[in-house]
Amino acid sequence: MKLSNMLVSTLREVPAEAEIPSHKLMLRAGMMRKMASGVYNFMPFGLRVIKKIEDIVREEMDNAGAQEFLASALLPSELWKESGRWDVFGPEMFRLQDRNNREFCLGPTHEEVFTDIARNEINSYKQLPLNLYQIQTKYRDERRPRFGLMRSREFIMKDAYSFDKDYEDLDVSYKKMYEAYHNIFIRCGLECNCVEADSGAMGGAGSAEFMVKSEVGEDEIAFCDSCGYGANIEKAPAISEKFDQEELKELAKIETPNVKTIDQLIKFLEINPAKLVKTLIYKVDDKVVAVAIRGDREANEIKIINALGGAVNFEMADEETIKKATNSEVGFAGPIGIKVDCLLIDEEVTNMYNFIIGANETGYHYKNANYKRDFEGIVGDYRKVIQGDKCPLCGGNIEIARGIEVGHIFKLGTKYSESMGANFLDEKGESRPLVMGCYGIGVSRTMAAAIEQNHDENGIVWPLSIAPYHVIVVPVITKDEEQMKAAEEIYNKLKSMGVEVLLDDRAERPGVKFKDADLIGIPIRVTVGKKIKEGKVEYKLRKEEDLEILNIEQVYDKVREEFEKSSLKL
């Protein structure tokens, strides 16, 4: 394509709304434009990248034996009520009514739809295994859309669903998808790690995320520096610290006037926070729940919600609720005699001796409290792992990093097939529920993640495989007939080789052309300037600082080499 005939919408200034590199660069490079909060139009360059990623996804899914189809984005509420998720998804679901007052939603995910198709189309084990996938726009009413494509209200996603006769076959399907995802992200030029994950509202027995390490990632990941274990911090098990056994001392109430926070209590009593147990109070749907954890630990709300069997609304309790539960002012909650629907005790607390707790009385705490002797509750892992915790596999040290989730795979099991009656007849003629898997890739988020990993101060540095165009040919002076003739010859030759190539034939200053090429991130730049009189041109890779002076014929060989390095065919 010739740039003089294209919509080139580059910006020199960073839009005020953009916070992270990918968001800034996609707007500046003219990849997309904002329509509303969390809603974007893909411009020509951006759409080409999306299509490249989609093509890679399709190839790998097809190679893994999956079949593509397209489901409706407008979904009737009956399916969601049948699965029990109409209320579980909460306010993130876009809900609407038609003119006959029938309820619908814009699909945030498609488990129910695929299950409905399966129960209507699959009736025998002879039709299994089956894997269906689609690439489609999803909709979620995010409370606070931010970071461009990282957290938007509509996003392009590939979702696949496998149907098997038993869990052994599900393991096979799951492994195929794992390998396909591994291939997809390598081909997209991403450095990606697979980590254990929470299944969230999707449900199911097993789950893993494909995470791109990035400082701007919204997820925290726990990694082992010894064995390579990785898990989303929502899922990572916290290994309890072991304490030296102590003789149990007598429980005693102590006066702590005007002490309402952990920091104030530490200073007042001059103690280590590891000798404190704090009691956090939450409102979970229509219940009040208290969680007792060590004073210097942070509660893991996902673990708490999972322990309670899920929740639509989960929030810290308000002052009135706390006063009713403790008969005291805020700041003195403790596990002894607290009036709540459920008391959860972090496992680490059960290993502690003679610790400090709130007394549920204004101005007082207890010292020398001990689990079992003084209080009991539902014991479990309710805290977040931290840097330096022990790995659950090898005992090595855990490190915490931030990451961007680009893919997620689930072993759903029979959660949806049982609730929606998706059954098949097995070899014995007996009816059994289909065993399902779910596999999602954020296509638009993958685009953003690729930029986060591949950019510099001048713009995007696209991997060759997903770049909007492979090569840009830049004549320095378009009015120079010799330069333009050579540039067009190179342009046409590269096109004939199957290279996706741009010719910057705009009547712009050379500096503007170079800045646009770098900003948009075209992997290879061929510059035709004064040296064309000697049959020479400049050849430069976007990812490298240095350039080479080559004969024109050498350019074609260099381009072929670059394709081979990226495992791309011409």
From Swiss-Prot:
Keywords: Aminoacyl-tRNA synthetase, ATP-binding, Cytoplasm, Ligase, Nucleotide-binding, Protein biosynthesis
Listed SUPFAM superfamilies: Class II aaRS ABD-related, Class II aaRS and biotin synthetases, YbaK/ProRS associated domain
Entry keyword Oxidoreductase: no
One annotated GO biological process: prolyl-tRNA aminoacylation
Signal peptide: none
Localization, UniProt: Cytoplasm
Entry GO terms, CC: cytosol
Molecular function terms, GO-annotated: aminoacyl-tRNA deacylase activity; ATP binding; catalytic activity, acting on a protein; proline-tRNA ligase activity; transferase activity
InterPro entries: aa-tRNA-synt_IIb (IPR002314), aa-tRNA-synth_II (IPR006195), aa-tRNA-synth_II/BPL/LPL (IPR045864), Anticodon-bd (IPR004154), Anticodon-bd_dom_sf (IPR036621), Pro-tRNA-ligase_IIa (IPR002316), Pro-tRNA-synth_IIa_bac-type (IPR004500), Pro-tRNA-Synthase_IIa_type1 (IPR023717)
Enzyme Commission number, as recorded: 6.1.1.15
Domain of life of the native organism: Bacteria
Gene3D superfamilies hit by this protein: Anticodon-binding domain, Bira Bifunctional Protein, Domain 2
Reaction it catalyzes: tRNA(Pro) + L-proline + ATP = L-prolyl-tRNA(Pro) + AMP + diphosphate
CDD domains named among the record's database cross-references: ProRS-INS (cd04334), ProRS_anticodon_short (cd00861), ProRS_core_prok (cd00779)
Enzyme class: ligase
NCBIfam families documented for this protein: PRK09194.1, proS_fam_II
Note on domains (UniProt): Consists of three domains: the N-terminal catalytic domain, the editing domain and the C-terminal anticodon-binding domain.
Similarity comment text for this entry: Belongs to the class-II aminoacyl-tRNA synthetase family. ProS type 1 subfamily.
Biological role: Catalyzes the attachment of proline to tRNA(Pro) in a two-step reaction: proline is first activated by ATP to form Pro-AMP and then transferred to the acceptor end of tRNA(Pro). As ProRS can inadvertently accommodate and process non-cognate amino acids such as alanine and cysteine, to avoid such errors it has two additional distinct editing activities against alanine. One activity is designated as 'pretransfer' editing and involves the tRNA(Pro)-independent hydrolysis of activated Ala-AMP.
HAMAP family according to UniProt: Pro_tRNA_synth_type1
Subunit comment: Homodimer.
Name of the protein described by the UniProt record: Proline--tRNA ligase
Lineage, opening ranks: Bacteria, Bacillati, Bacillota, Clostridia, Eubacteriales
Gene, per the UniProt record: proS
